[in-house]
Structures are given as C-alpha cells and as structure tokens.
Amino acid sequence: MSYNLDVDEADVAVLNQNLIRSKELFESIGKSLHKISTKSQTASSTINPVLKQVNQLTTNKHEVENGLKLLQEVSENASKINDLENLLNNSIENSPGGIKSYLINLNQSKNLLSQIKTQSKFKQFKGILYNFENLIDRSETKVQKYYQDLINGKDSRAIIDKRDEIKLIFQYFSNPQTKSTSNSGGNEEYVTKLYVRARSKRLIEKLKPIESSTKPAVKANANIPYEKGTNGITKYTDVLSGEIEQELIILNECQLSTHLIGPIVEESISRYNGIINKYNQVYFKTPQEIVDNVILILEVLNNLIDFKVKLKQIGLNRTLEQSNFINTFEQYLETNSVIFKEFIQAIDNRFQNLGKFNEINTQEVIVELMSKLRRLSEFKLALLQLIKNYSIGQWLVSQPPMRFVNVFSSVIPNSQPQANSDGEEDEVIQEYLLSSFYSDVIDAIMINIEIGLKKNTSGGDSLPSSSSTSASTNATSGTSSLSLNKKSTQGFILIKNLFMLESIVNRSQYLYQSLGSLGEERILRLKNRFLKLFLDDWSHASYIIIRDMTTIATQSAQHQQSQQQSSNTIGTGGGTVTNLSNKEKDQVKDLFKNFNESFEEALFNYQKYNFGDAILKKYLSNEIKKLILNTYFKLYDKYGNSDFTKNKSKYVKYDKLNFEKLLNERL
C-alpha cells in the first residue's frame, strides 16, 4: 500500500535525527574534554615542582656566573695592585724612569684606589683596600722625603739642576685629582710649606756665620780711624741680596710662584733689620760715638740703599714693605741725620782744644779733618739721603753758637737752585745742600784757624823761614822768624793752609764733584779774605804811595788855585811834575823814604816764608805784583824824574824796569 508521506514531516524527522546525533556527539565531546581536563590537572600538579627546580637552577646559574665574574675582576685588580706595589716599593732613585715614572705609578695607584672604592661590590675586600691605601700613603711620604732632600741645604745651582723633578713633584701635589689619601699632608699647601721652610732655613744658615762680623770692632786706639770695608755689614748685605736674587731665579726656573719669595726671605730680612737697629740702639748712642763712627754709619746706610735698590729692581717692593725693611730704613735715616751737625760741631771743638795756633799744628789739623771729610764724601748716596730733610745752614744751628759762624761765611746769597717741574727738584736741592755742607765745613776749618791765629800773642809764636832745614822744626823756633801776631803772617798761614786744603779737595773725586762750581766760588771768597790779610804789608806800602800822592796833589791843587798859576803841576795822574815847592819836595822825599822802608820790610818778611809749593808762591807773587807794580809806576812816572832832590839815588832806588825785575827775582 502506498503511503503518502507529508514532505514537512519528513524534514522534521530528519532534523530530529540530526539533533539526536548532535547531542550524542556533544556528550561525547564533553566527556572527552572532561578527561582532558582531568589529565591536564594531573599533569600540572606533576610539572609545577619541576619548573620550580628549573627556575631555581637558572637563578643559581646566574649567581655562580656573577660570582665568577666578581672573582675575575678582583683577581685582575689584585694583580694590578700587586704590580703597582712592586713598583712603589722600589726607592725613587732606583725606580726605572726616576721620579717621573714613580709619580706616574703613584698617580695610577690613586686612580685605581678611587675607582675601586666607588664600587660597592668591593667593600667586602677591606683588607685589600686598607693595604693598598697604606701603600699609597707610604709612597707619598717617600716622595716628600725625596723632595726635601732635593731642596734642603742645596745651593741655587744644585736646585736648578733638579728643577724638572721639583716641578713634577709640585704638579703632582697641586693636582686636585691626586689629593692625599691621609690627613697628614701631601697637598700643595704642605709641599709649599716644606719648600719655604727649607729655603728660608738655608738662607739663615748661610748668613749666620757672617753676622758676628757686623758688630763694630773695639778699637785699641781711639785715634785710629775706621777703615771702610773692615766691618762685615757690606759682605752680609751682598750675600743677603745675592741669595734673595738666586732664590727668585730658582722659583722662575722651577716655574713656581714668585710670591713664595716673601715667606722665604721674611725671617732673614727681619734679622737684617735687627742688626741695623742695633747700631743706633747699642753702638752709636752718643754724639761722640756718632762722630767717631761716622764712616761706618754711612757705610751701613750705603748698604741699606743698595739692598733697597736691588730688591726693587727684581720686583720685590712688596717684600720690602711686608718685612718692615722700609720702616727700618727710614728710622735709620732719621736717627743718623745728626751727623752733619755733629761733624761741624766736632770741628769747632777740635780747634778749641788746639791751644796755640801756628803753621805746623794748623796744617796737621787740616790734614786730619779734610781726610775725614774726603772719606765722608765717598758715601755720596748715603749723604744725599741723610741731608734731604735739612734746610740750608740748619746743621750750623747749635747752643751755644759755634765760634766761626758769627765771624765770616762764604755763603753766596740767592744761590739756591729754583724749583723746576721736571721731577728732578729733590735731587738738585739735595746736591746743593751737600755742596753747601762741604763748603760750611771748609769755612769752619779756615775761620777757626783765623780766629785762633788772631788770638795768639807775639810772644813765642813765630813762623819758620824758608831756610828751615827740617820739616819737623818747631814753629816757634828760629831767629829769622816772623811774629804770628802780624796780619800778613796770619794771612800767609791761612792762604797756605787753604791751598793745601784745596789740593786735598782736587785729589778727591767725590768731594770735588759735590762741591762743584758753587763750592769753588766759596773757596775763592775765603781766598780773597785771607789774601787781604797776607797783602797787609804790601797794601801798607801801596797805601803810602796813594795817600801821600793824594795829599801832595790836593795841597798842590789848592796852592795853584790860590796863586792862580798854570796847571803845570798836577795830582796823582799825568806825567812828571816840575816846579815843586820846597814843601812838596820834602813831602815827595818822605813819600819815597816811607815807601822804601815799608816795601823793603814787606820784601824782607816775604822772603822768610816757607812756601813749600811753587804754585802757591807764584800765586802770591802775582797778587803782590798786581797790587804794587802799577802803584809804584804811577809814583815813578810822577816824581821819579822830577827835581825834588839833587841826591836822587838816595830816594829813588828803582826805576820802573829795575823795580819789576826786583820783584820777579825776589818774589
């Protein structure tokens, strides 16, 4: 039978069947998944412990590897430390490459130590670090000792020869990266202190043996003058300034700071200041001590000036200030500027104690005093410094006043130089003051002699004649002697002494230059003053002519006027007169008679003088001729051939030619 099946029903049936199959399939899958899940859980519980072990093993492996790496680094650094230790334990002298190589190794050691200390992983190796640090400290101490050996007690040449090593050591310690690992020093400040201390000590030791020679020697005889250079102050100053200059050269050669020179020389200059101060505080306290030691005082000052100039030349002005030298210098000037007053006062005192004045003892005193002045003048720079605060003539002020001051001064008015604007005023004024002082000294000597000679009486005081056979003949002996009470004799002694004094000046380069043209002019004023005294006899003879001729001429003129005569008789001028009155004839006779007596006495006295110097004799001879020749010629021209007498030869002993010839022969 055929069944008619509905199509939709067929589809539903098919779908149901498929659903049933799908359900079965899903159930089967679910079971399988459950099995898988169960098995996975079982596997997981089994694998987890294994994974933990694997991870632990991996961690352990990394730790082992890191440990091995650390050990390797430590081993490498330990090897480096060992190598450096071997190098640093060597002496610097035996180190290959010397100090340069040693400092390189030391610098490397410091860098390595610094590098290791910054890494925390090395902190556990404290023993290595401690030993390495001690090694570096010992090595730096070794460098410092080597450095001290280089600079201690060595002269400049030895230091300069080692300048490269000194520079390297300074560079090492001045490098911030090489700062000392210890607290005991080793930086730039420390090595600088070592250098300053070593060089300062050497300088002091160099000077110490000379210091005792700077003390003024005790004189066995107070009259023996101090000899320039016998005191050790010049040597001391030369050594000090020379060594300071060498220390500066060393600093420059070693490329060290020149500012170190101050601390190096400070104590030595301080000792020098002490020596200088001691002169015035201990040795030259009284005026007499100052006068007795004036050459030494000036020698010391000359050295102070030289020292000051030398240090300024090498740029150490600041050192001079800081060492208190400038104060010492100025104090020395202030204290010893009294030498000008004391020197002239000593001259005045010397003549007051001379007793009777004569040719010989005055010459002796002049030689004595001018020798002192000549030696004084050799210290021109010192004198210019000492005199700079004086005003003209201030050294002559004293209480009571010195004797010669109120008698005569050769000072030339308005001779002081004018101020200028070229910066040389002080120097010019100082030169003028020094020249004036020297001239005042000469005034003091010569005017004191003049005062002393004028105080002498004729009794027993006489002048030896030129016929004296012995230079040592006493000035008061001899029958053919002249009274020292005569002006002409006093004038002769004064001029002769002045000539001798002038010859001493001319032989002294410094004294002659300092006196200059102004000093020469002042000596000339003294010479003219004394020449007037010397020419007193000749002036009297000349005066007789001038006086009597004037009298005769005046009376004749009056007579002519009253008698209204022609002017064939004239006064003191014109040609030969005639028609003389009896009175005039007698007056002319007396004139010739008085002149002849005065002239012959002057000539007689002149021939008794002991000139001893041809230049002096020629000078005086010329001055006499200038005074007497023209005067006599006027007399002869007026009355020599007149009719005043029949016995002409009795009165007119010389014509003009014979008169001049006589003077040339006898003067």
From Swiss-Prot:
Residues 557-570 have a biased composition (Low complexity). Residues 460-483, 557-579 are annotated as: Disordered. Keywords: Exocytosis, Protein transport, Transport. One of its GO terms (biological process) is protein transport. Its main location: other. Pfam families: Exo70_C, Exo70_N. GO terms for molecular function: phosphatidylinositol-4,5-bisphosphate binding. The keyword Nucleus does not apply. It is found in: Bud; Bud neck. GO terms for cellular component: cellular bud neck; exocyst; hyphal tip. Involved in the secretory pathway as part of the exocyst complex which tethers secretory vesicles to the sites of exocytosis. Also plays a role in the assembly of the exocyst. Belongs to the EXO70 family. This is Exocyst complex protein EXO70. It comes from Candida albicans (strain SC5314 / ATCC MYA-2876). The lineage of its organism: Eukaryota, Fungi, Dikarya, Ascomycota, Saccharomycotina.
